[in-house]
Amino acid sequence: MRTAMSNETKKTGSSFMEKLSTVIVDKRNLIFLLTIILLVFSAFSRNWVEVESDLTYYLPSDSETKQALDIMDEQFTTYGTAEVMVANITPEQAAALEPKIKEIKGVQSVDYDETTAHYNNLSALYSITFAYSEDDEACLDSLEAVKEYLSDYDLYVDTDLGNTQQETIDHEISVIMVYVAIVIVIVLLFTSETYGEVPVLILTFVVALVLNQGTNFLMGKISFISNSVTSILQLALSIDYAIIFCNRFKEEHRLLPLREAVIVSLSKSIPEIGASSLTTIGGLVAMLFMRFKLGPDMALCLIKSILFALLAAFIVMPGLLMLFGPLIDRTQHRSFVPKIPFVGKLDYATRYIIPIVFVVLAVIGYRLSSDCPYAYGYGLISAPKQNETQFAQQMIEDNFTSKNMLALIVPTGDYDKESAILDELGQYDEVDSTMGLTNIEALDGYMLADKLTPRQFAELAGLDYEAAQVVYAAYAAQHSEYGKLAGNLATYKVPLIDMFLFVCDQVDSGIVTLSDEQTQMLQDAEVQMNSAKAQLQGTDYDRMLIYLTLPESSDETYAFTDKILEIAEKYYPDENVYLAGESTNEYEFEKSFAVDNKVVSIVSVLVVMLVLLFTFNSAGMPVLLILVIQGCIWLNFSFPTITGKYIFFLGYLIVSSIQMGANIDYAIVIASRYQELKSKMHHRDAIVETLNFAFPTIITSGSILSICGFLIGSMTSEPVIAGIGESLGRGTVISIIMVMFALPQILLIGSGIVDKTSFSVPSITEKKSGHGKVSVNGMVRGNINGTVHGIMHATVEGDIDLNLISGSANEEQDDEED
């Protein structure tokens, strides 16, 4: 029966959703125009977003490491550096290169000697410091000049300068997106019922993707992880929305003309898809509560991407269905997705066995996942492929001992305390070396912070003693130390670095006159001292560098960082001291994870349970579904324990949230269908029909999400992103297996619990009556006197006389069947 709603139905009025859907469909040309404008805008604005590649940026603002990093940014200059290794070179050639590199414009210093720290295995390692801060583009120019000069050698460069890592990641993600697009097209062609629906779905995805990327700039700054994987995860997580709408449209279009079918299917899909998206959003909401702010950053990006996917499905896709409707009708084909009655029969036959097996597996998974080896830095994780920068780093690490440096920050003004701290730290085996103003040699065995009398300074600088006394007197006057002027200047002591820089100022002002040789010596010393002061002395704090013999990532290292702070606090009991470095960053990540892990787990379960509670109107069903998915999460993260492969802590938080929020949709599809069918037929038939119905949806969404995860895990050189992809792909496969081969049995034996914990929610009913041809869509109760044309999912109390075209019609027994 192809007809619109009857006149009587029109008289009684349409629902709000139908009115909204009608406006969307009828105004599709305007919507297309606005969408094109927004797409063009987004094509440009997608480049406006600032990408943050430093994970420490997202540390809690009250963490000690974050405060230390902020102080270093404000108070000290960090010059650009690079580790340059030249392989296959003799010691003589290596030594000859050092002065040549120093002569390159922009190179401030080159650290090289003939010890194994700089020459080993026929390779030379030059530690180059540039004359510009690490944020200055001039560093890159100087680095390129160094590379150009050494281009004839076997060269490997390790540096944090520039943004080559992000450029590499962007290129890799672009390649992955091409593969993902191919996978999506293949899966859609396989699972579709008409070829014409594929371009509709693809265009809907593209609109959502581009609009989401084009609005990232509104967030100001996003992490490199969010920038890299959000688009791929958006496609994988939100593909269900367009597919649900498309399937609903095809169902309605069997009875209704194109326009009416789109309107009715949209009005039904909005609440259905909206409810489906709530579980995914609910799982991501948990990350908003993390102290480590990378969680909220990624959660907001993913939630925004899902909202744009909903917007594209509800606003743009109806117009696309109208546009491609004739093509959809002409290109129908048989379904390539097979029926799987054997799975349902197997599940029914094993309903008393598999739940026990699942519980045992879940307990084992929980125990193993509790011992999951987490990494908090890059030292313990790796990607399946290496980019050029990582290969250079690996080559340098293979030939030379890597350095683990920490920066100790203390209040400025007391060189004696700083010297005592460095002396005490130097006694520990865990400390390889230290560097501060108090132990850097300046001239003739004197350290920068050594205090010199006028005579000592005169001998060191080659000044007349009388001239030195004049300079010391001027220094005392400038610093308001008038007691020194009145007393004996001969015993007045001033730190070498302070006096040298003061003399340089006086020479520039003309108060002190020096010979050309003295002036040159002073200028050379001034450059070195200003460099040291800029790096190690600020307005309020001084910085000391500590090089450890310990690895960056280990419990022993983390414990020793506490020991360093304990020693420093002994000398500054009433003042704040700070410690920063890769090891302290990782230690801070570990402490944040201890809290965030509990928060994410609890919040994600509570939010998803709340959504499921009102979806099923039962307290028992949410518990069963969440236990199944939580068991899948435990099993997923038991694999790193079994293989001994470290996983970045952030990957666990992100993937567990996505599993709880997205993979649970597979369980919802099965549970909803089974709840609908179990009262209409034997439980065995109900579970068989349920799996036949749910399999196309699960295999479509699940295969895309899992393949996307595995592609990310295998095709990127960024270890954190690779770990997220691998875990997501593995977790999705586990979830698919469990909802197909364990959840049905749990539903069969837990049906009584679900029924006993059910509750009813008062619903608003609308009285409808009509005569002639009436189109009915929805859950109804009442009497019908006439001939029925269409698809029924109903229980009829009374007499029926039907021609059964497809499906089944069975008389139900009064006693409930097992």
Q: Model segments located where?
A:
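Extracytoplasmic
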Residues: 62-67, 74-75, 87-129, 148, ...
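Short amphipathic alpha-helices in soluble, non-transmembrane regions
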Residues: 96-104, 138-149, 420-428, 557-568
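Glycine-centered tight turns that cap/initiate beta-strands
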Residues: 103-109, 152, 430-433, 573-576, ...
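Structural beta->alpha junctions
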Residues: 85-92, 127-135, 158-162, 381-386, ...
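Short, hydrophobic beta-strand segments
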Residues: 80-84, 123-132, 368-378, 404-409, ...
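Juxtamembrane segments of multi-pass membrane proteins
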Residues: 58-60, 64, 75-81, 89, ...
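Structural signature of multi-pass, alpha-helical inner-membrane proteins
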Residues: 4-9, 13-36, 43-47, 62, ...
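Membrane-embedded transmembrane helical bundles of large multi-pass transporters/channels
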Residues: 1-51, 134-377, 552, 559-562, ...
